[in-house]
Regions:
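Extreme N-terminus of proteins, especially the signal/transit-peptide cleavage junction
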Residues: 1-8
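Active-site and donor-binding regions of nucleotide-sugar-utilizing enzymes
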Residues: 8-146
Length: 146
């Protein structure tokens, strides 16, 4: 996890396989750009683990789609949200970068809003016709959307 005691700490959240791959590429690019002077923490899968991330918990805990699949997992997902917020507050990263999974991350963003930690979301979420307010809702919680 740590390449240097005083190196910037970047906290990443990826909650499904495609986000894990994007996160792994992001870690590699950041490591190259900083000459390896970088610390990484967060939530990710096998690809991010290959880049040195020790995930707070398995992404399979939050990588759930479909109403029938989500309903029985709500208590676990809510617990993982609380654990994520608590760990980020404990770690005091220089930035939090969420990758995809806006449903999980939205509550994390809201929970961290008063903590003065920059929040960036990588991979802009789709704004559907039946949820046109989604972009405004996300913009209110984030510092930057890529």
């Amino acid at each position: 996890m740590a390449d240097s005691e005083n190196a910037p700490l970047i906290w990443l959240i990826a909650g499904e396989p495609s986000g894990d791959l994007i996160g792994a590429r992001l870690i590699a690019a950041l490591r190259e750009r900083t000459g390896g002077r970088l610390r990484i923490a967060g939530i990710g899968g096998e690809a991010m683990a290959a880049e040195g991330l020790e995930s707070l918990f398995p992404i399979s805990d939050i990588a759930v789609m479909g109403l029938v699949e989500i309903i029985p997992r709500i208590p676990l997902i809510k617990r993982r949200m609380r654990e994520t917020i608590a760990r980020i507050r404990q770690d005091r990263p220089d930035i939090v970068v969420s990758i995809d999974v806006p449903g999980f991350c939205y509550d994390v963003w809201k929970g961290l809003r008063s903590d003065d930690i920059p929040l960036v979301h990588y991979v802009a979420p789709t704004v559907w016709a039946w949820r046109p307010d989604r972009a405004k809702k996300f913009a209110a919680e984030l510092d930057h959307l890529m």
